[in-house]
Amino acid sequence: MYKRQEDNLLKLDMLGHDDPTMIRMLEDLTGVNARQIPLDDPDTMSIFVSSKVLGFENDELLGPTGAVAIPEFNTRFTRGMLMDTLPKDFNTLVRLSGFSHGTDVWLGNARELIVSGTASVLETVGCRDDIMLYLISMGLDPKMSFKIMEAVRKGKVKKGGFQEGWVEAMQEHNVPQWYIDSLAKIGYLFPKAHAVAYVMMAFRIAWFKVHRPLAFYATFFTVRAKAFDAEYCCAGMDAVKQKIREIENNKDATDVEQNLLVTPVSYTHLRAHETSA
């Protein structure tokens, strides 16, 4: 609704973030300085593809990855993205963050290019900066590269097409046609610095999940739990699974029911940690 009135309204995006609070609590509980956590820790990186390092694999409710309860990668949508791309490094996670925060960047665009084998993850456009840097690397004039990036990331190319001479310039410098077509589909692109900040925070939290699990779960339920039912959480894995299915199958589930964080609770049972009231 606001997009139809945005030229006449002052809109303030005042976003709250729980992640810094989680980091502080995790540091207090463990004595680990989060800023010293290596962003290439192999065990932590592995949970974005598999849950094996957590002590279980391919759970029927949690799926194949270990990314549940990790910021940026906690939704079914982003976990599906992980399975389509199988990230092996931090740079790829940043690209995925760009995909998820952009508009018309992943579905119907980068995903199809990656799944079909037309392009690798790092060859596709994830963040606005990717366009300018890539076009400059292909030999385009830096000023034109910047203008193309700005027009694409604001959705102007999608709405009105490329300016005269842009497509010809890209073709003259051997920019693939699939790349040009991809640019024309984009409605909005996330800035890379923002994506890097989000993924750094997510990776540090993921490190605690792998290496300091009890502190991680205690912090998660303290900071992020919008609703919590101790009765079934303490009743064992079967009760947790039953509750998950009840909520998923109930089309009239309340907001409180939707917010019951039963999935992370099932993690604690799978990893042999006891939840007690």
What are the functions of these language-model segments?
Residues K3-R271, S276-A277:
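Noncatalytic, beta-rich nucleic-acid-contacting surfaces in large DNA/RNA-processing enzymes
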